[in-house]
Amino acid sequence: MKYNFDEVIDRSNNRSSKYDERLKKFGTEDVIPLWVADMDFKTAQPIIDACKKKAEEGIWGYTSRPASYFEAVQEWEEKYYGWKPETSHMSWCLGVVQTMAALMKIYTMPGDKVLIQTPVYSEFYDIPEAIGRVVVENPLVEENGSWHVDYEDFERKVKECKVFLLCNPHNPLGLVWDKEDLEKMAKICMENGVMLISDEIHSDLIFHGKKHTRTATISKEIHDYVVTCVSVTKTFNLAGLQASTTIFPNLRMKADFDRYWSSMDIHRNNAFSSVAIEAAYREGREWLDQLLPYLSANFDFVKEYCEKNIPQIKPNIPDATYLVWLDCRDLGMSNEELRKFMIEKAKIGLNEGYTFGRSLTGFMR
C-alpha cells in the first residue's frame, strides 16, 4: 500500500493536546505546534483496521493480554535488533516515563541520586525530582556541532548515584550511540553497582545508514544490569493509546515491577491499545519503511532552508528521532527573548532548550 504523508489533516477538533494546549502553553493559538513528539500523519492502515474492528464489537470490557502480544514484541526485536528476549521477562506499562518513575520508586529511596546526560528529554529531570530523588548531570560536550560523553565526569559522578537514565537513541540530539560508547557507559555502571534504565522509545526511527544497538545486547554481563524500555507508540504515532513494554534482565525484577502496578490495579492494556500495538508490530513495517525517507527529506529541507535564509540558526540534523535541535545562539537572544521571537515572529511553538539542560542558553527543539 502506498501511503500519502503529504496529506494535511486538521487536528483542531480531534482532542489533540499538541493543538488544544497552544493557548495555555504559548499564550496564543496562532502558532504551528511543534513542541511535542507527535506526528501529524495517519498511522498504518492495519492499525486503523484493527481499531475499527474492535470498535465494531461494541463491547470494551476488561481486556486480557494474549500470549501473541509479547510474542509480537519478541519477533520484532529478533528481526530488527538481533536479540530474542524471553516473553516471560516482559511487562506492559502505560508508557516509558511511567516505567522509569516506577523503577526509581521501587529501587531507590528519597534523596538518592540519579544520573542523566544533558541536554536530555525534560522528563529525565522532572520525574526523579517529583518523587524526591536528586538529579546529577553529566553534561554532554559539544565540539563543532557534534556531542560526546565526558567520561571523566561520568565516572566520577556515577559513583554517587543509584540509577543512570540513558536515552538511547538520544532525545533531543538525535544521537545514535555506537556500541563502544554504550559498552563503556554500561561497564562503568556495572562496576559501581548502578542500575541502568535504557529508554529506547525512538529506536525504530533511525536515519543516514546508522544502526541502533540495544544496550542490553552488548554482553551477558551488561545485560544483567540493564532494564530496557521500548514502545512503538512514537514509531506509529500511537501515544494516545498508552502502551510500552519493559524488558527485564531477570524474573525477580519483573515480579517487583508487576507487583508495584498491581497494587494500584494498573496492569491491563485498554481495549484498543491491545489490538493496535500488536497490529503495529505485525503489520506496520510497510508504513514505517515509507515514513523514514519522508522524514529524512524533511530534515534536508530544514537544513537547506536555515543555511539559505537564517544562517544564524544551525539545526542539528538527527540520526534518530524526528526531532531537530536548533542552535540559535548566533541570534544573540536570551532564552525569554528567543521564546517570544519564535511565538510572536516565527509563529511556531517549540520547546525551550533550557528545559533539556537548565544551564543552556540559545537552543530550541
Task: Locate each region found by the language model.
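Short Gly/Ser/Thr- and Asp/Glu-enriched loop/turn motifs at secondary-structure junctions
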Residues: 86-87, 317-322, 361
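N-terminal small-domain helix-loop-helix segment of the aminotransferase-like
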Residues: 2-95, 102, 280-283
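Conserved glycine-rich beta-strand-loop-beta hairpin in the small C-terminal domain of fold type I
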Residues: 278, 294-303, 315-328
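Helix C-cap/helix->beta junction micro-motif
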Residues: 131, 191-192, 222, 346
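Conserved core segment of the aminotransferase class I/II
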Residues: 49, 220-296, 304, 308
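Conserved core of the PLP fold type I
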Residues: 60-187, 204-205, 212-221
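Walker B catalytic acidic pair
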Residues: 200
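Conserved C-terminal alpha-helix-loop-beta "cap" of PLP-dependent enzymes
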Residues: 313-314, 326-365
